[in-house]
Regions:
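Short coil turns that delineate tetratricopeptide repeat
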Residues: 27, 61, 95-97, 131
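Juxtamembrane extracytoplasmic segments of single-/few-pass membrane proteins
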Residues: 1-65
């Protein structure tokens, strides 16, 4: 793998939190904790959203929505290892509306941890999914992995 300067890693691994959109798949009534947490998330109060999202994720174990936004909040508050764990749980949930984005944010978090190989794997999988993040994944991949 290519040696990437720390300041370049910091730039490439920076995330822009996704907007919250109600998913048709997660159309089950959301908990009061989840709704309150997502109000904090919308206000960009990521640390204020964490407790409610943790409670919602525990209460709705079959829904990955709370886990996904919890992961984003953890990443935004520099709790990278917790964010990585939550993203891995979302990915383990299989084919959901959050799968591609979870892989993308996981790639960014792994890159921030200087785990270039792990980021490489996630970005390749995203490209193979041919979803809406395909081009972004290919662009980021080209910047971290040398072309043969």
């Amino acid at each position: 793998m290519r040696e990437i300067p720390p300041e370049r890693i910091e730039l490439l691994s920076r995330i822009e939190p996704p907007a919250y959109e109600v998913s048709a798949v997660d159309s089950a009534p959301s908990s009061r904790e989840f709704r309150a947490a997502m109000e904090e998330y919308r206000k960009r109060n990521y640390s204020g959203a964490i407790a409610g999202l943790r409670a919602a994720a525990a209460a709705q174990s079959k829904s990955v929505e709370a886990s996904f936004y919890l992961a984003i909040c953890l990443l935004m508050t520099n709790e990278r290892s917790g964010g990585i764990q939550e993203l891995q749980a979302v990915i383990a949930g299989g084919s959901t509306p959050y799968l591609e984005a979870a892989r993308f944010y996981l790639a960014k978090a792994l890159l921030a941890d200087r785990n270039i190989r792990g980021a490489d794997v996630q970005l390749r999988v995203i490209a193979e999914m041919h979803g809406k993040l395909e081009k972004q994944a290919q662009t980021l991949h080209a910047q971290i992995v040398p072309t043969p």
